């Protein structure tokens, strides 16, 4: 093995298997682009994004870690959300939860 070398298993990595998902239509009603990262609590995103927030409670974007989705002004886009794992305790973001879901 060479220092820094990766030894990866064959095949595709399956992420979020068995977790609840939901697809939502999201519209950016603002006049600026809005970008949301992979692990941001979607329920607490910028309020210029219009969607069913109750369905997004406890959910994040179902995209690879470190990725993001960008919403241009006036753009409508369907996104898939996946439930947070672990103990389902969420702090920070817009401080709308700050505790257990």
UniProtKB/Swiss-Prot annotation:
Reaction(s) catalysed by this chain's protein: urea + 2 H2O + H(+) = hydrogencarbonate + 2 NH4(+)
Entry keyword annotation includes Transport: no
Pathway given in the UniProt record: Nitrogen metabolism; urea degradation; CO(2) and NH(3) from urea (urease route): step 1/1
Signal peptide: none
Transmembrane segments: none
GO biological process, alphabetically ordered: urea catabolic process
Keywords from the named record: Cytoplasm, Hydrolase
Lineage top rank: taxon: Bacteria
Main location per the UniProt record: cytoplasm
Protein name as catalogued: Urease subunit beta
Compartments it resides in: Cytoplasm
Gene (UniProt): ureB
SUPFAM superfamilies to which the protein is assigned, alphabetical: Urease, beta-subunit (SSF51278)
Name of the top EC class for this enzyme: hydrolase
Stated family: Belongs to the urease beta subunit family.
Gene Ontology cellular component annotations, sorted alphabetically: urease complex
Any GO molecular function: urease activity
Description of how the protein assembles with itself and partners: Heterotrimer of UreA (gamma), UreB (beta) and UreC (alpha) subunits. Three heterotrimers associate to form the active enzyme.
Organism: Actinobacillus pleuropneumoniae serotype 7 (strain AP76)
EC number: 3.5.1.5
Lineage, broadest ranks: Bacteria, Pseudomonadati, Pseudomonadota, Gammaproteobacteria, Pasteurellales
InterPro entries from the UniProt entry: Urease_beta-like (IPR002019), Urease_betasu_sf (IPR036461), Urease_subunit (IPR050069)
């Amino acid at each position: 093995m060479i220092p820094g070398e990766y030894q990866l298993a064959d095949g595709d990595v399956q992420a979020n298997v068995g977790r609840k998902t939901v697809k939502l239509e999201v519209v950016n009603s603002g006049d600026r682009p809005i970008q949301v990262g992979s692990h941001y609590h979607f329920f607490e995103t910028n309020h210029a994004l219009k969607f069913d927030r109750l369905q997004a409670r406890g959910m994040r974007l179902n995209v690879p870690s470190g990725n993001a989705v960008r919403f241009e002004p006036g753009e409508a886009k369907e996104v898939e959300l996946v439930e947070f794992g672990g103990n389902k305790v969420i702090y920070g973001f817009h401080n709308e939860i700050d505790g257990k879901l």
